[in-house]
């Protein structure tokens, strides 16, 4: 093999290793809900999915993965984080359940976030019983605005 061909082959192998190392695994997204995870029927809730900058699509999934909503309106929150928002304008008991997020950032899809459980309960109406619990989050890292997420 000629010295030039050997050098070229070595360069290609080094570049391939560098590209493979840079791709790595995508960080897991995080999921949270506002105003909280315990919601009264008829109230609204917004799920926030967060991931790194460069996300093209966020996906909010129900526990069985058959129901999902994609959002392409990804907002940049800062130099390293982006977010998508998914709204349910009038929550019903059918919306209760486990939700999680994932995102698409070329060249592929991230892992799923941890599950977040949405509970739909009637308010007791007492002054010491708030309609919702404070915001809750699950998962580890980093969207947009999309319309409602239908009950199954």
Curated annotation (Swiss-Prot):
Disordered, as annotated region: 120-152
Predominant place of localization: secreted
Organism: Homo sapiens
Subcellular locations according to the entry: Secreted
GO biological process terms held by the UniProt record: immune response-regulating signaling pathway
Family annotation (InterPro entries): Ig-like_dom_sf, Ig-like_fold, Ig-like_Receptors_ImmuneReg, Ig_sub
Cross-referenced PANTHER family: LEUKOCYTE-ASSOCIATED IMMUNOGLOBULIN-LIKE RECEPTOR 2, MHC CLASS I NK CELL RECEPTOR
GO annotation, cellular component aspect: extracellular region; plasma membrane
Ranges in a coiled coil: none
Name of the protein this chain belongs to: Leukocyte-associated immunoglobulin-like receptor 2
Keywords tagged on the record: Disulfide bond, Immunoglobulin domain, Receptor, Secreted, Signal
Span of domain Ig-like C2-type: 29-117
Lineage: superkingdom: Eukaryota
Disulfide bonds: 49-101
Signal peptide annotation: 1-21
């Amino acid at each position: 093999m000629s010295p030039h061909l050997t050098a070229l082959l070595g360069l290609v192998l080094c570049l391939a290793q560098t590209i493979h190392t840079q791709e790595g695994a995508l960080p897991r997204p995080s999921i949270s809900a506002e105003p909280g995870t315990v919601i009264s029927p008829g109230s609204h809730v917004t799920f926030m999915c967060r991931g790194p900058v460069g996300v093209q699509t966020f996906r909010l999934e129900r526990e069985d993965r058959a129901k999902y909503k994609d959002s392409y309106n990804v907002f940049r929150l800062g130099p390293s984080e982006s977010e998508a928002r998914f709204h349910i304008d009038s929550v019903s008991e059918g919306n209760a359940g486990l939700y999680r997020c994932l995102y698409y950032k070329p060249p592929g899809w991230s892992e799923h976030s941890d599950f977040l459980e949405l509970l739909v309960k009637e308010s007791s109406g007492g002054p010491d019983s708030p309609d919702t619990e404070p915001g809750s989050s699950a998962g580890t890292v980093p969207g947009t605005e999309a319309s409602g997420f239908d009950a199954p």
